[in-house]
Amino acid sequence: MEFLPKKIDDYACLHSQEENQVLKDLNRETWAKVLIPRMLSGHLQGRTLSMFSKMIKPKNILEIGTYTGYSAICLCEGLEENGKLHTIDINEELKEISSKYFKKAN
């Protein structure tokens, strides 16, 4: 997150839950293969989305802008049992990456 001072960002990341392996791999692949990787939600934003989702326990989530799927995977961590996430994106070229990681995340 580039909009926070580095010391605050470092502190928040240090005291946040670690990325699971699927998210680490997705993060790495996005930065290695995608043209504008900074659009990825990333570790701190992902943990924040996960926390909100776990607090609310939504039955349904609509995400507009899938990108490579990082934020969608984080949001799913708090879904109610049998809940559903609907995510849409205009860029079909990224669907292969997001679909692969959605399957890995289960």
Protein language model regions, located:
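A short alpha-helical cap/connector motif
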Residues: 1-106
